[in-house]
């Protein structure tokens, strides 16, 4: 439940829910599990801000354990599609698809707060009981394609080659803000708003 915000304007008092008020300042929140309805909302906000001013920066604050690959990729594809630069700030956790979104920000403008964490790993998948063997082979093939696609995105976003990414995503690979910076997924660590970030 979001608190309401009341502002005094030239037209009188105006009331907003908090995300709508943040949107006025070109701030987008990616909070919680990445799923279709959340992704639709994020994509709509990005397209709205792009239509308002395609040259002005958008700030995206991320705290997400990940979720649906297709929902997450709809967000990252939109981030790359629009002309407006998207700055990403990880607060709390970016895991799984959350890391794909966070690393898809404008290079040079991808940040973490000092106590935030990053987690990369393979996409999850599995067959439902009773699934035919041929269907299981199709699922396995699709999972391999998805893994390869996500690994390429991570390699392009970092200072690491595809072989290193593939090895590190074989199991859960946790990183602190400092480790994420050294890995190349982010460009700086923010400790105070308005102050210069810690960089390499």
Curated annotation (Swiss-Prot):
Reactions listed under catalytic activity: Hydrolysis of proteins to small peptides in the presence of ATP and magnesium. alpha-casein is the usual test substrate. In the absence of ATP, only oligopeptides shorter than five residues are hydrolyzed (such as succinyl-Leu-Tyr-|-NHMec, and Leu-Tyr-Leu-|-Tyr-Trp, in which cleavage of the -Tyr-|-Leu- and -Tyr-|-Trp bonds also occurs)
Compartments (UniProt record): Cytoplasm
Annotated active site: 96 (nucleophile), 121
UniProt keyword Protease, yes or no: yes
GO cellular-component term (any): endopeptidase Clp complex
An MF annotation (GO) of this entry: serine-type endopeptidase activity
Single biological process term from Gene Ontology: protein quality control for misfolded or incompletely synthesized proteins
Keyword Cytoplasm in annotation: yes
Coiled coil (UniProt feature): none
Pfam families: CLP_protease
The entry's keywords: Cytoplasm, Hydrolase, Protease, Serine protease
EC number(s) per entry: 3.4.21.92
SUPFAM superfamilies: ClpP/crotonase
Function: Cleaves peptides in various proteins in a process that requires ATP hydrolysis. Has a chymotrypsin-like activity. Plays a major role in the degradation of misfolded proteins.
Subunit record text: Fourteen ClpP subunits assemble into 2 heptameric rings which stack back to back to give a disk-like structure with a central cavity, resembling the structure of eukaryotic proteasomes.
Family membership noted in the UniProt record: Belongs to the peptidase S14 family.
PANTHER family per the UniProt record, alphabetical: ATP-DEPENDENT CLP PROTEASE PROTEOLYTIC SUBUNIT
Protein name: ATP-dependent Clp protease proteolytic subunit
Organism lineage: Bacteria, Bacillati, Bacillota, Bacilli, Lactobacillales
Gene from which this protein is expressed: clpP
